[in-house]
């Protein structure tokens, strides 16, 4: 039918055209934050069977990076990470960009119906830092921190084993200081 012109021809889907990237003008203007699971293949000894989490923050202007390991993946850990980040970052922080994970926001949970904020969001508000949430299921919007997680897998987690949480924390701190900044 299409060949003889009776059925309408469906036009092809339009090609995806990315929006222009908003360049940051100074350090602290926007910082990307994300959480990564430490691969279980890296855990041996008393750490075997446990879960550890790597919180990462990258300044979009200077690419300055701060990493910290946590035993818990929660809004409390996110708040503690934020406090440590604010102390470690040499400039004032204007905006923090995160995904929509429950460790950062209640945006997509039933609890979001009441205007209750997570500990992380309360601390941001208290510190006067704007919270920008990326579009759901679009990790490329947090591309710098996602890329750093991939590089961590290739350079660090592929070659290291951890016997305890303290061992993981120390090695991660040493790796970040030596290899990234």
Walk through the language-model features, giving the residues of each.
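Mobile genetic element proteins and their domesticated derivatives, centered on retroelements
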Residues: 1, 34, 57, 63, ...
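Basic, flexible linker segments flanking DNA-binding modules
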Residues: 1-41, 102, 109, 115-121
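An active-site-proximal beta-strand-loop segment
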Residues: 33-65
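Short, solvent-exposed loop/turn segments at secondary-structure boundaries
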Residues: 44-45, 69-70, 107-112
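Active-site beta-loop-alpha junctions of metal-dependent nucleic acid enzymes
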Residues: 50-51, 67-95
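Acidic/histidine-rich, metal-coordinating catalytic segments
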Residues: 89-112, 135-137, 142
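Charged alpha-helix within mobile-element recombinases
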Residues: 113, 119-181
């Amino acid at each position: 039918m299409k060949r003889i012109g009776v059925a309408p021809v469906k036009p092809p889907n339009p090609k995806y055209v990315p929006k222009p990237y908003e360049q940051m003008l100074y350090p602290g203007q926007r910082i990307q934050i994300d959480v990564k699971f430490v691969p279980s293949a890296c855990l041996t000894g008393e750490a075997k069977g446990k879960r550890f989490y790597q919180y990462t923050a990258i300044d979009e202007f200077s690419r300055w990076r701060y990493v910290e390991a946590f035993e818990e993946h929660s809004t409390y850990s996110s708040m503690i990470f934020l406090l440590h980040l604010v102390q470690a970052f040499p400039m004032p922080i204007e905006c923090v960009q995160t995904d929509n994970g429950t460790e950062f926001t209640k945006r997509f949970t039933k609890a979001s119906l009441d205007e209750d904020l997570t500990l992380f969001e309360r601390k941001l508000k208290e510190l006067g830092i704007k919270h920008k949430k990326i579009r759901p299921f679009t990790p490329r919007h947090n591309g710098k921190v996602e890329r750093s997680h991939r590089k961590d897998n290739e350079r660090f987690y592929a070659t290291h084993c951890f016997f305890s949480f303290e061992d993981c924390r120390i090695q991660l701190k040493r790796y970040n200081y030596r290899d990234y900044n």
